[in-house]
Amino acid sequence: MLASEIIARYEAYCPQELSMEGDISGLQIGTLDKEVDKVLVALYIREQTVVEAIEANAGLIIVKHAPIFRPLKDLVADKAQNQIVLDLIKHDIAVYVSHTNIDVVEDGLNDWFCQLLDIKETSFLSQTSSEHGIGRVGKIAPQTFGDFAAKVKATFGLDSLRMVTYEKADLNRMIERVAI
């Protein structure tokens, strides 16, 4: 299937127009005018992501966070981030970025996180249009902040979790409302 057809189907669900102003989204590296047998989906593109894509013979990576965020001043291979871009180009791997639009879209990442964490009766954290918004605020069963943090850690398989509190006792504070 053409990469452009894959992206057309993806954008039928999650259009770029949902992206927040100034956000990087869409094709960032390569071309969509090529046949693709395998697609890799990633949160970030790191060296290992590129190795995995090459080994799997993936012709397209759909990624949440853009591999090129600031303008490149050069494209020399002795810089790790540049080497990633060079390897993607060398192996003809296209990169399509879907950042805030996958957060905003109904049943996107924000809604999925709420589902995983049993967050109910949600509303938008910030309205982005008449029908959409980024982030979610909702209700959870009453529990301590520490218990909810442990649930987040377990749900996402995290080794550690950074929590910002005013006092150590905040971990024992009861909460019923959270934001994603």
Predicted features and spans:
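Hydrophobic structural segments
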Residues: 1-180
